[in-house]
C-alpha cells in the first residue's frame, strides 16, 4: 500500500468538553457533561490505531498560517511526496507548507482540506487488536464527486476502488456520480467521497444525514454496549444497522460541536 490515513483532525469549539465526549464514545470512559475551559489549542484521543486530533476553532482570519475549517479533514501519508509536490506546483495548484509538521495542506475540488505527509517518516499504526477503537473511514462531501475523485487519482496517485453493496442495502444511491471510495482494504475502510443527498435521512428514517458536511467513522468491538451507554446518557443517535456496507453495523450521532460522527462494528 502506497498510502494510509495518518491523522484525523476534528474541529471543536470547547476542547475539554469535546475530549471528554470522545473518550466516552471511543475509550469507554465516564461521560461528564461539565464544561471546563481548556487552556490548549489541541488534544489527542488515545487508544486507537491512528492519531485522532481535536483542535479548537478560533477567529484567525488575519493569520493565513493557521488552518481553520468547520469540516473534519484527514492527513494522508503518501509515498513519493516530493514528486507529488512537484506535480501540483507545476500545475499551479496552491498549497500551504507546514515546516513544523513537514507537511503540505491543499484543497481538492470540493474544497475539503487534505494534509499530505511522507509515508516513510511516519511510524506504522499500532496493532488493531490492542485498541479500544480503530479508524474506519473519512467521508468527504463533494459537489462534483467525479471531479474530486479524478483530482485524488491524478495528483495523489491513489487508486479508486469499487463500492460493494450489502444484501440489506438501504435507500442509498451508490452510483459513481454520487458515491466513490478509495479503499485501504476489503472492509470499505479509507476515503469515501459523496455528493450531498438532501432527502437521505427522510428516505431512511434517520435523525442524521451523514451525506452532508462529511464525517469521520471509527470502529469499535461492541456497538450494542455503546448504544446502551448512549441511551443511559440521553445522547440521541441514529441506529442505521447494516444498510450501506456489507456486515457493518453503523450508528450516527453529533458531537458537542455538531460534527456528525459515525461509529460502526463488523458483525
What positions do the PLM features span?
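A short, acidic/glycine-rich surface segment
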Residues: 32, 59-64, 122-126, 168-170, ...
Amino acid at each position: 500500500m502506497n498510502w494510509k490515513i495518518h491523522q484525523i483532525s476534528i474541529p471543536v469549539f470547547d476542547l475539554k468538553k469535546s475530549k471528554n465526549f470522545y473518550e466516552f464514545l471511543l475509550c469507554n470512559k465516564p461521560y461528564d457533561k461539565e464544561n471546563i475551559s481548556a487552556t490548549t489549542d489541541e488534544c489527542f484521543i488515545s487508544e486507537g490505531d491512528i492519531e485522532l486530533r481535536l483542535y479548537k476553532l478560533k477567529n484567525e482570519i488575519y493569520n493565513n498560517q493557521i488552518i481553520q475549517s468547520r469540516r473534519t479533514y484527514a492527513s494522508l501519508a503518501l509515498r513519493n511526496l516530493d514528486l507529488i509536490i512537484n506535480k501540483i506546483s507545476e500545475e499551479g495548484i496552491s498549497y500551504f507548507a507546514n515546516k513544523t509538521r513537514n507537511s503540505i495542506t491543499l484543497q481538492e475540488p470540493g474544497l475539503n482540506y487534505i494534509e499530505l505527509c511522507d509515508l516513510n517518516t511516519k511510524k506504522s499504526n499500532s496493532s488493531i487488536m490492542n485498541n479500544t477503537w480503530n479508524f474506519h473511514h473519512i467521508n468527504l462531501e463533494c459537489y462534483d464527486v467525479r471531479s474530486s475523485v479524478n483530482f485524488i487519482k491524478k495528483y495523489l496517485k491513489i487508486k479508486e476502488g469499487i463500492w460493494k453493496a450489502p444484501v440489506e442495502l438501504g435507500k442509498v444511491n451508490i452510483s459513481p456520480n454520487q458515491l466513490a471510495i478509495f479503499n485501504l482494504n476489503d472492509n470499505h475502510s479509507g476515503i469515501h467521497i459523496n455528493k450531498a443527498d438532501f432527502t437521505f435521512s427522510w428516505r431512511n428514517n434517520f435523525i442524521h444525514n451523514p451525506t452532508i458536511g462529511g464525517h469521520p467513522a471509527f470502529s469499535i468491538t461492541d456497538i450494542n454496549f455503546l448504544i446502551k451507554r448512549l441511551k443511559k446518557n440521553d445522547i440521541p443517535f441514529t441506529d442505521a444497522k447494516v444498510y450501506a456496507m456489507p456486515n457493518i453495523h453503523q450508528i450516527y450521532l453529533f458531537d458537542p460541536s455538531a460534527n456528525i460522527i459515525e461509529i460502526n462494528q463488523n458483525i
